[in-house]
């Protein structure tokens, strides 16, 4: 048994806490809001995961734990740096469970950790996982990416169960690129379906989006084959087709003609692709990423959906 701290009591953090407890660990789940922590501790449920009970070995608290064998960081990428400044120094190693690119610095999550906690060992947990399915114990697979083989094996061993299979990978850059860029492509996939352009168009967009993920991963020092696995292709397929995908849902709304502000106001959860799109395009300077660039322009109000679609469809033909 290990002691696991999960920092962030949203749907994803709570699902990870449930999985860690299911794997036999002693778990502390940190919630930023004290009232929410009390409610979850008393009801043994997170309202965002209605119907799923928090196991008794999960302690919900608004106070940071003083120590843990592993600390899972399950807060949005845009809030990760500020959190690191408050986190007790004894909490290490760290497992980054966020996806995206920091808007201000263009850093990937593990890069933020390296700057905020220099010298601390860190891994990345990423893959095609919806929080409610993980919490419910449905079968899933994911990736623990870290250059340190002992760390990734230890994290995988601590969190794995027969229904939650964790694979190791020594390419955290490629794994993070897949997790970040797929949210942007998912907005485009939703817009295609929302606009009534059909399943053929979505399939083409997902496939060409995967090519963009691979080009960016290689440009940033990752490997193409990493993007072809769970952290890239797997996550891309789920996020571009799953009804529970927040980024895909936003794209659907935009494709149906909703204004971005209205679509965001109707959704309480963080839609990471909105902040990630412009940061990703900026980080990818010099890399050919027409789909992600079109999404960033659409979200910034620099182009209409019709103009973006026309621009993509009229690009010069080339070999695949």
Annotate each predicted stretch with a short phrase:
Residues 96, 121-126, 166-170, 228-229, ...:
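General beta-strand structural signal in soluble alpha/beta enzymes
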Residues 1-53, 59-62:
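NAD(P)+-binding Rossmann beta1-loop-alpha1 motif at the extreme N-terminus of oxidoreductases
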Residues 54-139, 155-157:
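Rossmann-like NAD(P)(H) cofactor-binding subdomain of soluble oxidoreductases
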Residues 112-122, 139-226:
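Internal alpha-helical scaffold of NAD(P)-dependent oxidoreductase catalytic cores
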Residues 186-193, 218-228, 232, 236-320:
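NAD(P)-dependent Rossmann-like dehydrogenase/reductase catalytic/cofactor-binding core
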Residues 7, 15, 35, 75-78, ...:
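Conserved active-site and cofactor/substrate-binding residues in soluble primary-metabolism enzymes
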């Amino acid at each position: 048994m290990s002691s696991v701290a999960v920092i962030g009591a949203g749907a994803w953090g709570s699902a990870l806490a449930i999985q860690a407890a299911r794997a036999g660990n002693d778990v502390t789940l940190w919630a930023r809001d004290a009232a929410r922590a009390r409610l979850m501790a008393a009801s043994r449920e997170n309202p965002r995961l209605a119907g799923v009970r928090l196991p008794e070995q999960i302690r919900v608290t608004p106070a940071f734990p003083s120590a843990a064998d592993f600390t899972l960081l399950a807060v949005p990428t845009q809030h990760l740096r500020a959190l690191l400044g408050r986190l007790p120094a004894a909490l290490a190693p760290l497992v980054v469970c966020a996806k995206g690119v920091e808007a201000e610095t263009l850093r990937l999550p593990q890069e933020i950790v390296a700057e905020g906690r220099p010298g601390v060992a860190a891994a990345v947990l990423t893959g095609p996982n919806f929080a409610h399915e993980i919490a419910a114990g449905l079968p899933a697979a994911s990736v623990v990416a870290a250059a340190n083989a002992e760390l990734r094996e230890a994290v995988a061993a601590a969190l794995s169960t027969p229904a939650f299979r964790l694979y190791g990978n020594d390419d955290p850059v490629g794994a993070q690129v897949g997790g970040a860029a797929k949210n942007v492509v998912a907005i485009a996939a939703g817009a295609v379906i929302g606009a009534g352009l059909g399943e053929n168009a979505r399939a083409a967009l997902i496939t060409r989006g995967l090519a963009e993920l691979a080009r960016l991963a290689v440009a940033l020092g990752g490997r193409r084959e990493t993007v072809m696995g769970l952290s890239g292709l797997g996550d891309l397929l789920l996020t571009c087709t799953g009804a529970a995908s927040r980024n895909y849902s936003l794209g659907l709304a935009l494709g149906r003609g909703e204004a971005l502000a209205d679509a965001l106001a109707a959704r309480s959860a963080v839609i990471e692709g909105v902040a990630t799109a412009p940061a990703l395009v900026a980080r990818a300077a010099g890399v050919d990423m027409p789909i992600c660039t079109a999404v960033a322009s659409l979200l910034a109000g620099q182009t209409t959906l019709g103009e973006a679609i026309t621009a993509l469809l009229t690009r010069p033909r080339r070999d695949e």
